[in-house]
Amino acid sequence: MNKLSTIELSSTSKNLKLVDGNLYSYDGKRFIKYMGSSKNFTVPEGVETLVSRCITKSMTTLNLPSTLKVIEGWSLESMSGVNLLNIPASVTTMYTYSFHANTKLRVAEGNATYKSIDDVLILNKAGTKVIMASRNATTYNIPNTVTEIEKNAFYYCTKMISITIPDSVTTIGAGAFYSCSSLKEITIPQSVTSIGADAFLHCGNLTAINIKGTANRISGAPWGAQYGNRAINWNV
């Protein structure tokens, strides 16, 4: 659908509809495709879901409605140009791969599911889990309220140079640092007892995984690291 310039629907269609040339589900709850030429767009009230790849053009501003609940994977991943995206209080579901790499994310304070830290980290509302991160930062500092770095939390954070993991963290999920290709070194605190499969897969420059505590205390090494066990330094 990325190369479409116009969409025409049968006048009898009961599944889809066009509003100002843009494609929606017939009930208006799913935003399917932005076909406009303007770089500034407001998704209308009533929309509850942004469908995968609904906007694949360069934009300047995008305003999301107060009715929005779900931002599907890849929805805005190809939408470059928006420096800061405000996530409404109504949103309950979104993914790290929903957004373009250069877009900062800011969650409305009234959101009951998520909260943002410095427009970079997205945590659960309680602040105990890192859910995802904006991918345009070079330095990431995880607050000491966090106990878990979730699966794919730092997916494709290719600009990451350094990350600070506090002693409060006990779990690092599968693929947590997938394709953090600029990261050269990471220190795992003694509090961490579990690292998921492929946590460091495709981290091509990661040559030092420094783990505090006794050797081999965390199973599954080297967790997809390109340099294998040579990259792991126990008991640092």
Where are these regions (language model features)?
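Structural signature of tandem-repeat unit edges
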Residues: 2-22, 29, 33-49, 57-70, ...
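Short secondary-structure boundary/capping segments
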Residues: 22-23, 224
